[in-house]
Curated annotation (Swiss-Prot):
GO terms for cellular component: host cell; host cell nucleus; T=1 icosahedral viral capsid. InterPro entries: Capsid_protein (IPR007291). It is found in: Host nucleus; Virion. Keywords: Capsid protein, DNA-binding, Host nucleus, Host-virus interaction, Late protein, T=1 icosahedral capsid protein, Viral attachment to host cell, Viral penetration into host cytoplasm, Viral penetration into host nucleus, Virion, Virus endocytosis by host, Virus entry into host cell. This is Capsid protein. Homomultimer (Potential). Interacts with Rep; this interaction relocates Rep into the nucleus. Induction: VP1 and VP2 are detected 12 hours post infection, while VP3 only after 24 hours. One of its GO terms (molecular function) is DNA binding. Self-assembles to form the virion icosahedral capsid with a T=1 symmetry. This very small capsid (25 nm in diameter) allows the virus to be very stable in the environment and resistant to some disinfectants, including detergents. Essential for the initial attachment to host receptors. After attachment, the virus is endocytosed and traffics to the nucleus. The capsid protein binds and transports the viral genome and Rep across the nuclear envelope. It comes from Chicken anemia virus (isolate USA 26p4) (CAV). Residues 6-47 are annotated as: Nuclear localization signals. It comes from the Viruses. Residues 1-43 are annotated as: DNA-binding.
Amino acid sequence: MARRARRPRGRFYAFRRGRWHHLKRLRRRYKFRHRRRQRYRRRAFRKAFHNPRPGTYSVRLPNPQSTMTIRFQGVIFLTEGLILPKNSTAGGYADHMYGARVAKISVNLKEFLLASMNLTYVSKIGGPIAGELIADGSKSQAAENWPNCWLPLDNNMPSATPSAWWRWALMMMQPTDSCRFFNHPKQMTLQDMGRMFGGWHLFRHIETRFQLLATKNEGSFSPVASLLSQGEYLTRRDDVKYSSDHQNRWRKGGQPMTGGIAYATGKMRPDEQQYPAMPPDPPIITTTTAQGTQVRCMNSTQAWWSWDTYMSFATLTALGAQWSFPPGQRSVSRRSFNHHKARGAGDPKGQRWHTLVPLGTETITDSYMSAPASELDTNFFTLYVAQGTNKSQQYKFGTATYALKEPVMKSDAWAVVRVQSVWQLGNRQRPYPWDVNWANSTMYWETQP
């Protein structure tokens, strides 16, 4: 029998097939009875185009012996991209580079931990910084400072993609770690995250809520469309050369840039929210004809491009995304926000708990914390965001574009997202405290006189 629930004003619900159903009863708010109007099955109509949770399947698994709840709360600023030309070649292209107001927020524990890291370090709030800031000390050698950090390096090209939302986020975590700043003054690696939660074996996602508000006008019509999807709705190109990471399909220090720094411009070109004029390294046509116009195609050394894929404003709208109008086009109220809520693992196979630190791990290293052993960077849900406009390039499909500009001492945010997320850590590893006490009291019985 289905579970039932009752709410005020005579509302009844029943849990069937993975979600709560509102029972279609006659309304009791008025003196006379009125039949409830069927709104053309709105939920079924939307799910016919995009189903954020394509099925549920519950599997009875043993629960962990002990658990701890972790909560995140903060704000994410979706900003426009910047360009930092350092030589004449990049400076010549800078006047013809355009970016699109698109973003992608992945719900995974790794990026939430990065979003809550220290505010005074590399590429945190405000975007990438060309160098590492010293936490305490001003010596040139890392061993002479505490914590051990390097001074900012010169002639570097920092960059980041729109998917690195945690760089422009201010996130609080509860419970707090009072020793996190001194233990991890730099950006936390997978090894650092594993050591931070070394006593826990499993983790699961409980709930994440997003509230998105458009903050910048782009003409007379510029709503921000947002759509929450299960996992990665768009699959990235799986190329052997750039598939060292099983999920993000990128290589640290390669394309797309992940916030790293390098000495040469040609090694790590900034591609933050940049789109290529045409795909790099097009196929070479050996035969030519006398008709048509000669077109010179760019190769990978001339085009700034990325493997990342984002949805346009028209695509999100066609899939049933919500719209948030900026102030000035609509009065600001609760309905000005796009509300999204993601619950559970979003896994049709019903895998509720995921591996944080593999069992039997004595020394935590990056190899143990990387997939498939650890699922710390598993994407449970993804929020796709794009701002539309009435004047856009044809191949952008209604997405607002802008000319890239050099960085100034302030960021230009076109949307703000409020986030609340709840996670839980679990542990199935023995021994229990009383097992340890029993072992201590019986371990040396044979050696006693």
